[in-house]
Amino acid sequence: MSEAKSGPEYASFFAVMGASAAMVFSALGAAYGTAKSGTGIAAMSVMRPEMIMKSIIPVVMAGIIAIYGLVVAVLIANSLNDGISLYRSFLQLGAGLSVGLSGLAAGFAIGIVGDAGVRGTAQQPRLFVGMILILIFAEVLGLYGLIVALILSTK
């Protein structure tokens, strides 16, 4: 009888896995994006040290991806209670996977574009605007996952 109202005992496991997936996958994407872009900045700064601050944009954008995962992980963690239903728990898992995996993909895209863009901008400064536009499109991938995760986690 109590399972119909509150769900099985193991239901909270899936919600916790959603919070973990949100944080872990988005942090992996952000770390990769930061490392890959940072490598490009380090290589570029040997020849053009005056461009370091201008080239830091990909690193900042990669860091924002981790914030998306943190927001969803906190929302999921705050909604946990003893009697969570299995339906709600699977919604939380879906929300975590949504923001986490889209953050992972966005982080990879930001890292690759940031590395190549920073190195290219050092040789041809007119490439900067193109790099920023591509970075924005890569960042939006993570934002799409955040929007879906917010919809799922607040259902």
Curated annotation (Swiss-Prot):
Alphabetical list of CDD domains matching this protein: ATP-synt_Vo_c_ATP6C_rpt1, ATP-synt_Vo_c_ATP6C_rpt2
PTM (free text): Ubiquitinated by RNF182, leading to its degradation via the ubiquitin-proteasome pathway.
Keywords attached to this entry: Cytoplasmic vesicle, Hydrogen ion transport, Ion transport, Membrane, Synapse, Transmembrane, Transmembrane helix, Transport, Ubl conjugation
Protein's cellular compartments: Cytoplasmic vesicle, Clathrin-coated vesicle membrane; Cytoplasmic vesicle, Secretory vesicle, Synaptic vesicle membrane
Transmembrane annotation, as ranges: 11-33, 56-76, 93-114, 132-152
Pfam families: ATP-synt_C
GO MF annotation: an example: proton-transporting ATPase activity, rotational mechanism
Residue ranges annotated as Lumenal topological domain: 1-10, 77-92, 153-155
Bilayer topology: Multi-pass membrane protein
A Gene Ontology term for the protein's cellular component: vacuolar proton-transporting V-type ATPase, V0 domain
Primary location recorded for the protein, binned into one broad class: membrane
Site residues by UniProt (Essential for proton translocation): E139
Topology Cytoplasmic: residue spans: 34-55, 115-131
InterPro entries reported in the protein's UniProt record: ATPase_proteolipid_c-like_dom, ATPase_proteolipid_csu, ATPase_proteolipid_su_C_euk, F/V-ATP_Csub_sf
Functional summary from the UniProt entry: Proton-conducting pore forming subunit of the V0 complex of vacuolar(H+)-ATPase (V-ATPase), a multisubunit enzyme composed of a peripheral complex (V1) that hydrolyzes ATP and a membrane integral complex (V0) that translocates protons. V-ATPase is responsible for acidifying and maintaining the pH of intracellular compartments and in some cell types, is targeted to the plasma membrane, where it is responsible for acidifying the extracellular environment.
Oligomeric form and interacting partners: V-ATPase is a heteromultimeric enzyme made up of two complexes: the ATP-hydrolytic V1 complex and the proton translocation V0 complex. The V1 complex consists of three catalytic AB heterodimers that form a heterohexamer, three peripheral stalks each consisting of EG heterodimers, one central rotor including subunits D and F, and the regulatory subunits C and H. The proton translocation complex V0 consists of the proton transport subunit a, a ring of proteolipid subunits c9c'', rotary subunit d, subunits e and f, and the accessory subunits ATP6AP1/Ac45 and ATP6AP2/PRR.
Homology family: Belongs to the V-ATPase proteolipid subunit family.
UniProt name for this protein: V-type proton ATPase 16 kDa proteolipid subunit c
Organism, scientific name: Ovis aries
Lineage: Eukaryota, Metazoa, Chordata, Craniata, Vertebrata
Encoding gene, per UniProt annotation: ATP6V0C
